A protein has these predicted regions:
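Conserved beta-strand hairpin/beta-sheet module of binuclear metal-dependent hydrolase folds
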Residues: 1-45, 132-144
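Short Gly/Pro-enriched turn/cap motifs at secondary-structure boundaries
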Residues: 6-8, 102-103, 122-124
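Conserved S/T- and glycine-rich ATP-binding loop of Class I adenylate-forming
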Residues: 18, 55, 123
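Metallo-beta-lactamase
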Residues: 24, 86-93, 117-207
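Short catalytic-loop micro-motif centered on adjacent basic/acidic residues
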Residues: 26-29, 51-53, 120-122
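Hydrophobic residues in well-ordered beta-strands that form the structural core
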Residues: 29, 77-81, 142-143, 183
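Active-site HxH/HxHxD metal-binding segment of metal-dependent hydrolases
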Residues: 33-116, 196-203
Length: 207
């Protein structure tokens, strides 16, 4: 397994390329901008693009989806159904994505990627349909805009909720053991570090 990070767009969104190099398959997580760079990135990996996975529907995590599909017309795009409307622009994400590509995931769904398995955890707060994507065996999570290093995502966009954010952070903190946390912005962190240092996680854990 390899995980690479590329920061894209004016808000420096972290897009992740998750590869199972043995099976030669990969997934793009939160392709927010700069589709041509991302396409070249996938090509250099030598892996076939199996999924495009979205932690939520905001423009800075989804804007490269449509141009990527022009090169990969058979690749499914996954998002939680509650986030198929962009909470910032009000734009329907899937007016840009044809019905042949759109897929919805929910709490507990699992997505196989070669020998890897991604599990979906619903984590509303930043948006109504925010999710985290968990590699349980490897203890790696893609936290989107739910959990950041010593912080959490904004809750003042349409569909956001601070009480729901705290509940989601409490659920993440309750995961067993330590985890590598790969957020939608800024540097990666660890769940154990956030349990100790993140005031929002500590508040969520106390609920």
């Amino acid at each position: 397994m390899t995980i690479q990070t590329m920061q894209v767009g004016p808000i420096m969104t972290n897009c992740y390329l998750l590869c199972d190099e043995d099976a030669k398959v990969c997934a793009l997580i939160d392709p927010g901008d700069e589709a041509e760079r991302l396409e070249q990135w996938v090509a250099r990996s030598g892996c076939a693009l199996r999924y495009i996975l979205l932690t939520h529907g905001h423009f800075d995590h989804t804007s490269a989806v449509r141009p990527l599909l022009e090169k990969h017309p058979d690749v499914p795009v996954y998002i939680h159904q509650k986030d198929c409307v962009d909470g910032q622009s009000g734009e329907l994400l899937f007016t840009r994505v044809g019905p042949e590509n759109q897929r919805y995931y929910k709490e507990g769904d699992v997505l196989p990627l070669g020998g890897l398995t991604l599990r979906v955890m619903e984590t509303p707060g930043h948006s109504e349909g925010s999710v985290c994507l968990l590699l349980d065996k490897e203890h790696v999570m893609f936290s989107g805009d739910t959990l950041f290093r010593c912080s959490c995502g904004r809750c003042d966009f349409p569909g956001g909720s601070y009480p729901k954010m705290l509940s989601s952070l409490g659920r993440l903190a309750a995961l067993e053991g330590d985890w590598r946390v790969l957020p939608g912005h800024d540097r990666e962190t660890t769940l154990e570090g956030e349990r100790r240092m993140n005031p929002y996680v500590r508040q969520g854990s106390a609920r």
